[in-house]
Amino acid sequence: MAKMSTTHEEIALAGPDGIPAVDLRDLIDAQLYMPFPFERNPHASEAAAGVDHWLSTWGLTDDPAVAAMISCTRPAELAAFNGPDMDSGLLQIAANQIAYQFVFDDRAEDIGRHSPGRLLPMLSESVAILRDGQPPTTPLGAALADLHRQVQERCTPAQAARWAWNSREYVHGLLYEAVAQAHPAPVESGLCRSIRSLIAGVEPFYPLCEAAQRCELAPEELHHPAMRRLSRLSADAAVWIPDLFSAVKEQRAGGMINLALAYRRTHRCSLPAAVTLAVRHINSTIREFEDLYGEVRPELSPSGIGYVEGMAGWIRGCYFWSRTVPRYADTLTAPAGL
């Protein structure tokens, strides 16, 4: 891999037309490679209402702070951008899951910030539900059990099993994040990327992308090395893009597991320069995804093509959602200058 320069002279903080970026969002828009055009599911508004009802049913928005977070995060909008072709039922499951993961992630961050061990009851309950079908003991666990039920009713047994496996990996990743946050020494960029991959929470949605197809993928297609590589590339790109837009918020909160902030620590540069370096890394990832997909597409089944298009949808959707979601509004207040 070519060495990335971090000198002020070699990092251009302007768009291709040479017009200087005003704020970080301008900078990201100007430099990020996004080959996938904007799309939106027509059932977005119904999904948003469904999310509100589902969260209320399980008592997750009884806390005003959680209700405010959901309002600023717009989980149904993210689902609609990621899955523009999903039917209304599958879109609702995806939207519920996104909302759940935001609640779960924020709760885990609050609990484990200073003492990772305090996360163990919460994470153990989730693993017991996902792995063993154990009954929940908390409102958050009850919501997860219901989400698991929704997936089992809509997906094939194999798809539901993959969903549960990927979801357990996400749960385990949150403990890694808590340990990294509590560690006195900064996390180096390679380890940061590894932890970020674990807590991305994107791959649990890929079985839903498969469920949106006319039939299951054959095992040899689903587990082909190229398909596994496409899954990794798309999940990483999809979660790193929001890292660009959340960098200001995470920096103020003392966050460690963020791609842009990892570059800033490693290269001791300004946040705009770090964002530019992170964009370069993301661009190379998206291009590798695009090139590999182009190579294998002629060999894929129609369901395989739809499955990979679902992965691409996460790259596209996370970008267009991150640009305007109130959760990352700080991006508009941060100057793009070095």
From Swiss-Prot:
Cofactor binding notes: Binds 3 Mg(2+) ions per subunit.
Alphabetical UniProt keywords: Lyase, Magnesium, Metal-binding
> What's a GO biological-process term for it?
terpenoid biosynthetic process
Pfam families with a match to the protein in the record: Terpene_syn_C_2
Question: Which residues are annotated as site, described as Plays a critical role in the stabilization of intermediate cation?
Answer: F102
The short motif DDXXE motif is annotated over 105-109
Q: Which residues bind substrate?
A: R196, K249, R327, Y328
Residues the record marks as site: Plays a critical role for substrate recognition: D106, E177
For this protein, what is any one GO molecular function term? metal ion binding
Give the record's family classification.
Belongs to the terpene synthase family.
For domains, the record's comment is: The Asp-Asp-Xaa-Xaa-Glu (DDXXE) motif is important for the catalytic activity, presumably through binding to Mg(2+).
- Name of the protein in question: (-)-alpha-amorphene synthase ((2E,6E)-farnesyl diphosphate cyclizing)
The species this protein belongs to is: Streptomyces viridochromogenes (strain DSM 40736 / JCM 4977 / BCRC 1201 / Tue 494)
